[in-house]
Amino acid sequence: MFERNQKTIFVLDHTRYFSIASEEYISMDFLKGKPSADGGATGAAGNASGGGGSQFSKSLWTCACESSIEYCRVVWDLFPGKKHVRFIVSDTAAHIVNTWSPSTQNMSHVMNAMVMVGVPSRNVPTSSDYSVIHGLRAAIEALAEPTDEQLAAMADLGTDELPRIPNKGRVICITSARDNTSMKSLEDIFNTVLVQQNALAAPPAKKGLVIDHCHLVILNIVPLGVESLVTNRSLLKISPLLDVEIHTVSAPDISYKLTHLILNHYDLASTTVTNIPMKEEQNANSSANYDVEILHSRRAHSITCGPDFSLPTSIKQGATYETVTLKWCTPRGCGSADLQPCLGQFLVTPVDVTSRPSSCLINFLLNGRSVLLEMPRKTGSKATSHMLSARGGEIFVHSLCITRSCMDEAPSITDGPGGRVSDYRTAELGQLIKMSRMLPLKVKDPSAPPLTRRLPRYFPLTTSSSILFHLQRHISWLPHFLHLLVKEDMDKQDEVRCQQHIHELYKSASRGDVLPFTHTNGARLKLSKAKDQYRLLYRELEQLIQLNATTMHHKNLLESLQSLRAAYGDAPLKSEPGASLLRSYTESPLSPERLEPNSSGSASGSSNSNSLLKASKRRMSSCGQRSLLDIISSAERSQSNKRLDFSGRLCTPLGQVAKLYPDFGNKDKDTVASGASITPNVKEESVRS
């Protein structure tokens, strides 16, 4: 609730040094005169070279005041009444500009107070009494003061639970130091005062709230063109209570630096609306395109973009942060079908509130108009991702849904990889989930079946991959029969009923009745003979009973079915115990690995079915008889048998050394043209057993 950005305190250095010019000169144009030769803002070098018009330069104090007040304006525009900003001016003492009270948390109060403070005087003699340390001490004391929200929380919790109130804050100090040593001294003093303040806030004194953590940001500003001896430093943890970061920036660029910092301090994002058509100020008959930069919550972009969209970003001249570029969309009439759902709305404030393009855009929105913003996709097309509109005198950015909406129809499961599959057993899967629901018990029941027994044993995902579950829609007694097979507490009466149903299947097979298939979903169930259909049915039924055979009644059913299969001429082969469990519980005799679509015609359907059945039975029976080591060893032996072994190993007795080149060096020396003697080079290799 009480985050670190809820309390922010600006400490402004009001010493004599801040009365000097920032060295960024601005030309003055008069209505009846001509503009200066420089034609705008120039630097110190341009001023030295001379110019035809009048120029002036802001002081360091003016640059610091304008940028800090603009910082708090953005905070109060985007978080009205939720985030608090205070100002403290430091010279010979600390001057409190405003408090945590809502009556002083507004632009009018702060600006009137800053006018009364004024620019530091250059005629004041240099003295050690003028220091920014006075303001830093007052800032720590201000952090210990509770806000109205903290007071309300303390009233709810009671006085005995005050340490439970979180109290964090941030101090932004705008000053100017000589070197890193002076900056290090400033950090040490701040850390010491922070520890002392927490000691005063602890019992029994209880003077204010304990400061849990403080983030100190020091901005070391210098005139334009002046190099500073203070080194920039990223966020560094000084103590468990204090984090410090240091930035050295020229006075004209301090506004860009504070805008960059506020993005991280309050989790904001910058958006630049480009190509805004606007009439020229001096020529009403022509128009030009302008850009306006706005600030808002970062979530306005994060909740809109999906994986198929990218945010186009750019960096403004003079700035160091990125801004998202969105294009002005020309208003056009659209029906309800063209409107996207809104994912969220967030307050908006312009970066430069006094510029003419910002003023025109604000007035356009406050008059009841809305603006759609476009963003390009990766493919090059554009999508309307945001909308600007105003309500109640406040401007909002609406994040529009550019991906699939929750109100859209869900994508069909048949559109996934692997082609269209339309016979998923969705309803049966839901019933299975309800039946398999487990609840924790305080006391373990010793008579309860083990956990693995209650898990689903066999569940084909599609109807076309199973004969047994495909027929339950057409044979009336089959659903009840399947329910009895998976019962955990099957009794003798259930066993008798199942025996009767199994004998009915045997009688139907003896009469040659064709199983009632109405929907085959391809060619998987297109078997030319009823005998092949019953064989597959018996095999799947045996697999189902075998996976659930935990009671004596299940085992009796399994033996009865196996005897019927033997009488039918389809006796199962003996296999190792548990070998069938190596197959997936979602596979069936009609899975693609077991039975492929028959494309050879009806004449060869019977032979192909028989061969597939035999191959499937061989795979199921041989599964588990060979280990992975046996398979790899067999492959290595088959490869080694294709090559002849080294003759030295074959001809040399075990334990002796074989010569690698036995005939090398035995040729007549006369045959050598050079007549030089050849030294035999004999290499030996030991024979490994």
UniProtKB/Swiss-Prot annotation:
GO terms for cellular component: cytoplasm; INTAC complex; integrator complex; nucleus; perinuclear region of cytoplasm. Residues 578-619, 662-689 are annotated as: Disordered. Its main location: nucleus. One of its GO terms (biological process) is snRNA 3'-end processing. Residues 599-614 have a biased composition (Low complexity). A motif (Nuclear localization signal (NLS)) lies at residues 613-619. It is found in: Nucleus; Cytoplasm; Cytoplasm, Perinuclear region. It holds the Pfam family Mat89Bb. Phosphorylated. Keywords: Cell cycle, Cell division, Coiled coil, Cytoplasm, Developmental protein, Differentiation, Meiosis, Mitosis, Nucleus, Phosphoprotein, Spermatogenesis. Belongs to the multiprotein complex Integrator, at least composed of IntS1, IntS2, IntS3, IntS4, omd/IntS5, IntS6, defl/IntS7, IntS8, IntS9, IntS10, IntS11, IntS12, asun/IntS13, IntS14 and IntS15. The core complex associates with protein phosphatase 2A subunits mts/PP2A and Pp2A-29B, to form the Integrator-PP2A (INTAC) complex. Belongs to the Integrator subunit 13 family. This is Protein asunder. The lineage of its organism: Eukaryota, Metazoa, Ecdysozoa, Arthropoda, Hexapoda. The gene is asun.
